[in-house]
């Protein structure tokens, strides 16, 4: 996301389990263990389409367009502002739940960013939203004409913040750039500098995925318009391979056991074996584009069926590509709700800057979107 509060459409995934606490409505949900998470807390959530959703043993957190962090107890779907200050209106910098941009987790703390005169500032806070303090600052790029630039998009993964800077296209030799910031030490390094060609720009977090030590991102050539999908390695800081002719209608890729999984335009759901270089179409789809979310046990797909974006469909398949459920989406107002985050008991949907609906994962043959609990007049959390 460019330094503005627009959440991109992206890939996601999670496992088909229910928290046992849901069977006892009157009791407080049991705290989840590490086995309940699709990825470990702090790792990049490849199963989600939204960026700023955090799931830990303390509960679930997400950041809305209103710049308020919201929290739900483990197993619950009721989200509240992460602030326990009395009489707080939850709308300004004095609120514990308020932040400028981004939300991540690492080692018992939440992380976010604010924007000062000298560029983006990385902040650390306690899990209840209290005790905001500065960790460090991200670099600001200086153009040939002396102008300063700090716009870009960011992601969190395993103790690092990854910042994808916009290219400074006024420079004679411009290109995109990616910076890795350590959340513990405040130190950083530039990634893939030797491998990113000149006159290229990033497609942002919509096309980025991080799986273990692999960092996948899309590179667009600003001169020819051609796009490639880069397969980078975080240990070496180098791009190991690229997939050419990556259509704007393709999804981003997720990797498991050296196999890439993605939607390919005019083909369908595909697998690409990195060892052999062989691509296989596993589930043909006649749709304009699609964004799959891969979990351990199932695949959720939201397809855009027509070029005018006026028809969308939800699909659920098992990992052997057997169709479990399919349903056309309906607009709410002008827009279709989009899949945002997947937990053990819910597929959350996003509309107009917040989570508004969910699907209960206990029965994936029923893809009915249910409204989220109304917490507008309820207490805050902290």
Regions found by a protein language model. Name each.
Residues 15-19:
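Hydrophobic core
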Residues 56, 64-66, 75, 106-107, ...:
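Short loop/turn segments that connect beta-strands within the blades of beta-propeller domains
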Residues 28-46, 68-92, 120-143, 170-197, ...:
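Surface-exposed loop/turn elements that mediate protein-protein interactions on large endomembrane-trafficking
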Residues 21-24:
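C-terminal motif of bacterial Sec signal peptides marking the signal peptidase cleavage site
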Residues 1-11:
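Bacterial N-terminal signal peptides that target proteins for export
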Residues 62-64, 111-113, 162-165, 216-218, ...:
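Residue position within the beta-strands of beta-propeller blades
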Residues 45-56, 91-107, 141-158, 196-212, ...:
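Repeated scaffold domains used in trafficking and secretory/extracellular systems
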Residues 163, 175, 203-209, 217-218, ...:
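C-terminal regulatory/effector modules of DNA-binding transcriptional regulators
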């Amino acid at each position: 996301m460019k330094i503005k509060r627009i959440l991109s459409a992206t890939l996601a995934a999670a496992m088909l389990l229910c928290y046992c606490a849901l069977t006892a409505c009157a009791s407080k949900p049991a705290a989840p263990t590490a086995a309940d998470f699709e990825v470990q807390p702090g790792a990049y959530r490849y199963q989600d389409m939204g960026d700023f959703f955090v799931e830990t043993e303390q509960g679930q957190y997400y950041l809305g367009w209103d710049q308020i962090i919201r929290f739900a107890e483990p197993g619950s779907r009721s989200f509240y502002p992460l602030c326990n200050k009395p009489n707080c209106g939850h709308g300004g910098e004095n609120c514990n739940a308020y932040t400028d941009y981004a939300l991540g987790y690492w080692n018992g703390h939440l992380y976010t960013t604010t924007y000062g005169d000298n560029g983006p500032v990385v902040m650390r806070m306690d899990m209840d939203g209290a005790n905001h303090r500065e960790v460090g600052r991200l670099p600001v790029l200086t153009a040939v004409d002396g102008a300063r630039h700090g716009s870009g998009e960011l992601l969190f993964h395993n103790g690092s913040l990854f910042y994808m800077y916009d290219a400074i296209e006024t420079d004679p030799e411009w290109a995109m750039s990616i910076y890795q910031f350590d959340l513990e030490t405040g130190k950083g390094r530039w990634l893939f500098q030797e491998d990113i060609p000149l006159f290229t720009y990033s497609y942002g977090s919509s096309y980025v995925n991080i799986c273990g030590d692999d960092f996948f991102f899309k590179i667009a050539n600003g001169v020819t318009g051609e796009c490639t999908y880069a397969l980078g390695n975080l240990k070496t800081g180098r791009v190991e391979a690229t997939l050419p002719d990556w259509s704007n209608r393709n999804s981003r890729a997720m990797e498991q056991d050296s196999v890439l999984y993605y939607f390919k335009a005019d083909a369908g759901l595909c697998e690409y074996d990195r060892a052999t270089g062989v691509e296989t179409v596993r589930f043909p789809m006649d749709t304009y584009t699609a964004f799959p979310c891969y979990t351990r046990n199932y695949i959720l797909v939201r397809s855009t069926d027509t070029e005018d974006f006026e028809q969308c469909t939800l699909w659920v398949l098992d990992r052997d590509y057997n169709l479990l459920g399919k349903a056309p989406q309906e607009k709410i107002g002008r827009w279709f709700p989009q899949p945002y985050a997947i937990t053990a008991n819910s597929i959350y949907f996003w509309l107009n800057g917040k989570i508004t609906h969910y699907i209960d994962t206990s029965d994936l043959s029923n893809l009915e979107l249910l409204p989220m609990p109304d917490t507008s007049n309820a207490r805050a959390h902290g």
